[in-house]
Amino acid sequence: MKNLNRILLSIKFMNKYFTYLIAIISGLLGVFAFSPFDYWPLAYVSLLGLLYVAKNPKKSTALLSTFLWAMGFFCFGVSWLNVSIHQFGGASLGVSYFLVGLLAAYLALYPMLFTYLVHHFKVQSAVIFAVIWTLTEFLRGWIFTGFPWLQFGYTQIDSPFYGIAPIFGVTGLTFFTVWASAVIFNLVSSLFKTKNLKLVLANALLLIIVGGLSAYSSRIHFVKSVEDKAISVTLAQGNIEQNLKWDPNYFYSTLAIYQKLITENLGKTDLIILPESALPTLENAITPFFEGLERAAKETKTEIMVGTVFQDTKSGKLLNSIMTAGNPDFPYQPNTQNRYNKHHLVPFGEYVPLESILRPLNSVFNLPMSAFQSGEAVQPSLIAKKRAFSPAICYEIIFGEQVRQNLKQDTDYLLTLSNDAWFGDSIGPWQHLQMARMRALELGKPLIRATNTGISVFVDAQGKVLAQAPQFIETTLTYKIAPAEGKTPYSVLGNMPLYALSLLFLLLHSMMAFIRRKMNIL
C-alpha cells in the first residue's frame, strides 16, 4: 500500500510539473506567431496550451501555470527592451533583465485575471473564453496608459482570416483567434467523453462554418486604390547609430547625411520624408536650416516632412513633432498649423512618471530626450502635395483607437515616423512594423513608414508591404503610392460592435445558465 501511495504521489507530482512545462513552452511558442517569424498557426497552439493550464481543476495550479505561460510569452516577446535599457540606458545586464522580467510579471497579471475569471465562473463556452480574454486585453491596453503589444490578432495579418480586421479591428481578430482556439480545445476535450458526441459534431461544424466565413471575408474589399492621385514619395533612412545620435560631436555628420539624402532627391520626387527626431537638436535652434529647406523645396516643387524636437514658443512644451517645408499653402514657420505633435508618449522613454523620485535612482531613468510633453489627442491632418496624411509617431501606431480617431474624411494616407535604433537588431522593429501594417488593414488606408535604421516601408490598404528598404544601411526608398477611397466598418464604428456583441454573448449565456438552473430545480 505504501508503494502504491508513493506511485500515486509521484504521478501527481509529475502531472503538476508537466503542466508547468506545457505552460512555459506554449508561452514561448506564441512569440513565434508574430513577426519576424510569422508562423501564424502557432498562435492557436500557444492559446491551446494556455487553455489547457487555465482549466486545471486546482485553481492555484492553474494560476501559477498561467503565470509561467505569461512569463515565457512576455519575457521572450519584449526581450528587445534589453537593448535600450542595457546599451542605451546604461543599466547593467543584470538590472536590464530584472526590469524586463518585472514588466513581464506585471503583464502576466492580465492572463492570470483571465484564468481566475474562467475558474470563478466555471466557464465552458468557447465564446465566453473569448469575451473574458477581450476584457483582460482591453485592461492591458488601458491601465497605466496601456501596453497593447503582442495581441494575438496581429499574428493573423498574413493568415486566411485577415479579412476580419477591416470589420472588427485587431481586437476582433484577437477575439476570433481565442474563440477558434477554445472551440478546438473543447472539441479535443469532448473526444474523451463519449456522451458528448453531439457536442463534438456541433463544435466541429461551428468551427468549419465560422472559419470558412472568416476566410471568405478576406475577399471583401471596402476600399479601392485611386491610381490617378498617386504621388511619388521618398523615404530618407539616415541609419544613425543610437549611441551617436545625441552626441553633440556627431551633430554635423548627421546633418550632412540628411542634407545629402535630401539634395539627391530634390526635383525627382513629390515628397521627401525624414524619420522621427531626424536632427538631434531643437528645431528652434536651427531655424535658418529649415528656412533654407523651405526655399529649396519650393524651388524644386518637392515638399519635405521632417521629424523634429520642437519647443512650443507659447506653451514652452518640449514636443516630439513633424513639420513640413515647401507647402505653398502652409509656408514654414515654427508655429505653423501644418504640424503634428506626438500625443501618446513612451513611459520612461519620452517622459518619466514620478520624475523627481525616479530620475536620481538610476541612469536608466535618464535616457536622452526623456522629458517630452504630450500634444493634443486629436489633431488636424498634415498636408503635403495637396494630400492629407494622418500621422502617428513611433509608439503611437500601436494604439489603434487613437489612430482611428485621428482619421479624417479626407485622409489619403497613414503616416508613421519612427526611430527603432533603440531596439537594435532584435525582434522589436519587426513586431512594430506588423502593428503598423494592421493599422493600414483596419482603416483601409495605405501607410508610409519612415525610420532611422529601418524598417522603412510602403504598405497598401490591405496591409501588404509594397516596397521595403533594408535595415541598418543609409539609403532612400522611393515609391509611387496611390491613396484609397472608401471606408472600412472598423474605421467608422471602431470596437463598439465587438463590445456590443460581447455583451450580448454574456447576456445570452447568463440567461441560458439561469434557465438550466430553474429546470434542474423543477
Curated annotation (Swiss-Prot):
It is a multi-pass membrane protein. It is found in: Cell inner membrane. Its EC number is 2.3.1.269. Its main location: membrane. The keyword Transport does not apply. The active site is at 276 (proton acceptor), 342, 394 (nucleophile). NCBIfam families: lnt. This is Apolipoprotein N-acyltransferase. It comes from Haemophilus influenzae (strain ATCC 51907 / DSM 11121 / KW20 / Rd). The lineage of its organism: Bacteria, Pseudomonadati, Pseudomonadota, Gammaproteobacteria, Pasteurellales.
